[in-house]
Amino acid sequence: MKKLLSMFLVLAMLVTICSDNIYIANAATNKKKVICIDAGHQTKANLEKEPIGPGAKTTKFKVTGGTSGLWTKQTEYALALKVAKKLQKILKKRGYKVIMCRTKNDVNISNSERAAIANKAKADAFIRIHANGAASKAVNGAMTICQTKKNPFNSDIYSNSKLLSEKVLDGVVDKSGCKKLYVWETDTMSGINWSKVPVTIVEMGYMTNEKEDRALNTASYQKKMAEGMADGIDEYFKELKK
């Protein structure tokens, strides 16, 4: 009887140890990726200047108010936040941890400060949501933006930022059906230059184009944009695993 009891206790200990190991393994496997979302602009522009990157002599406005729809009169900052909140909800459902740079329009957060939020969170991806404008009302389509491979501030994350930009652009185009433009590589964007984590700016469309302005003013199209971004983020991480 004592022998059977001893065997039972040993078996129970083994089950407990194995269960703990399984739990630890699953926890490691399911470790959440961190996505930082920046809804571009804000209600009131801050026209004070800040360096465009760490140690830079060149400066830009801390943050502008953005553009607005020629037909709908919807502001870019309001549109960006609507899509950002939709993206937040979708990403959380997909198991991501989401950090929001802002959750309301009446804030005062510079572009370098927004990048600092992503850096502090050690985000796996930094998604900056914007909309475009042009002198010609005929111009339309979505594009993404990242730094160049010779960026003086963060060239070490160029490859990942470019890949992120490509995948997010593909996702947005596939989901919304909008015209695909390109990934614009530039070192003039403060919010990109200050970032220490893979980053992209998503220009969802032109608010100076009637068709896109009206589409971007609908909840259904905004949701498509958010879903497309989420799909692109998924594909980005899949590609990194290859």
Label the predicted regions.
Residues 1-242:
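Catalytic-site microenvironment of enzymes
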